[in-house]
Curated annotation (Swiss-Prot):
Gene name of the record: pcna
First-listed, main subcellular location of the protein, grouped into a coarse class: nucleus
Lineage: Eukaryota, Amoebozoa, Evosea, Eumycetozoa, Dictyostelia
Entry-linked PANTHER family: PROLIFERATING CELL NUCLEAR ANTIGEN (PTHR11352:SF0)
Similarity comment: Belongs to the PCNA family.
Species, as recorded: Dictyostelium discoideum (Social amoeba)
GO CC terms of this entry: nucleus; PCNA complex
GO biological process entries: lagging strand elongation; leading strand elongation; mismatch repair; regulation of DNA replication; translesion synthesis
Keywords attached to this entry: DNA replication, DNA-binding, Nucleus
Localization, UniProt: Nucleus
One MF term in the entry's GO annotations: DNA binding
Name of the protein in question: Proliferating cell nuclear antigen
Function: This protein is an auxiliary protein of DNA polymerase delta and is involved in the control of eukaryotic DNA replication by increasing the polymerase's processibility during elongation of the leading strand.
Cited NCBIfam families: pcna
């Protein structure tokens, strides 16, 4: 028997809105430690890594590990039925069951909605994610990254990210011209942590990425006030959003090779 209860159904709704345009279906791997999801987009350029730890749920019960293969499009539609303040309970009987149940309850418990989604068989691929010693780690307001991607996508399709101790520069060029946006580390100690930019740089790094993917990642902005970009030459950038005390949503994007 698997059952997990979230105080905010809106959290899972925001997660699905962030990934459903990249991946059509995926396995939610449930274990006593929590729920995880790893999935590659159709072009094999982006890897999604979602971790929701058991201690972040109001209640969490998982007798044994099981995988719930779900259509993310269908799940996203059902989650839209949840009110912003509703709680969410997820139930699955065992590996023999072909459905998973989602229950939404209003704060006053005067409205309860339950939906069953049929499970689908998805080949379960596990990707090895190695911890790297990155050349540059940039922590910045997530809304700022979203704005940068939105502004620069008007001009070009490939963004060059250059990072060093002095700042991080986002550059694009296209048929109509070029553009650059530079973000410097926050020096004012009075700026709240969730509004400050912090750059840890061991050595300068310059990488090119498809802007459309970075723009897609920023759909996760409502999940967290901050985003972390971890970069090193020749390996995927990691764009990570911390989800309160529940876990994190990370995107790995391979650089464009000229």
């Amino acid at each position: 028997m698997f059952e997990a209860r979230l105080l905010q159904a809106s959290l899972l709704k925001k997660i699905l809105e962030s990934i459903k345009d990249l991946v059509e279906s995926a396995n939610f791997d449930c274990s006593p430690e929590g729920i995880s999801l790893q999935a590659m987009d159709g072009t094999h350029v982006t890897l999604i890594n979602l971790v929701l730890r058991n201690e972040g749920f109001e209640t969490y019960n998982c007798d044994r590990s099981l995988s719930l293969g779900l259509s993310l499009v269908s799940l996203s539609k059902i989650l839209k039925c949840a009110g912003n303040d509703d709680t969410l309970t997820i139930r699955a009987r065992d590996n023999e069951s072909d459905t998973v149940t989602f229950v939404f309850e209003s704060p006053k418990n005067d409205r309860v909605s339950d939906f069953e989604i049929k499970l689908i068989d998805i080949k379960n691929e596990q990707y090895s994610i190695r911890k790297s010693d990155y050349s540059a780690v940039i922590k910045m307001p997530s809304a700022e990254l979203q704005r940068i991607c939105r502004d620069l996508s008007i001009i070009g399709e490939i963004v060059t990210i250059s990072a060093n101790k002095e700042g991080v520069k986002f550059s694009v060029s296209g048929d109509s011209g070029s553009g650059n946006i530079t973000i410097k580390p926050t020096s004012d100690s009075d700026v709240p942590a969730e509004q400050a930019t912090v750059i840890e740089s061991k050595e300068p790094v310059v990488l090119n990425f498809a802007l459309k993917f970075l723009s897609n990642f920023t759909k996760a902005t409502p999940l967290s006030p901050m985003v972390t970009l971890s970069m090193s030459e020749g390996i995927p950038v990691v764009v990570e959003y911390k989800i309160d005390d529940l876990g994190f949503l990370g995107f790995f994007l391979a650089p464009k090779i000229e």
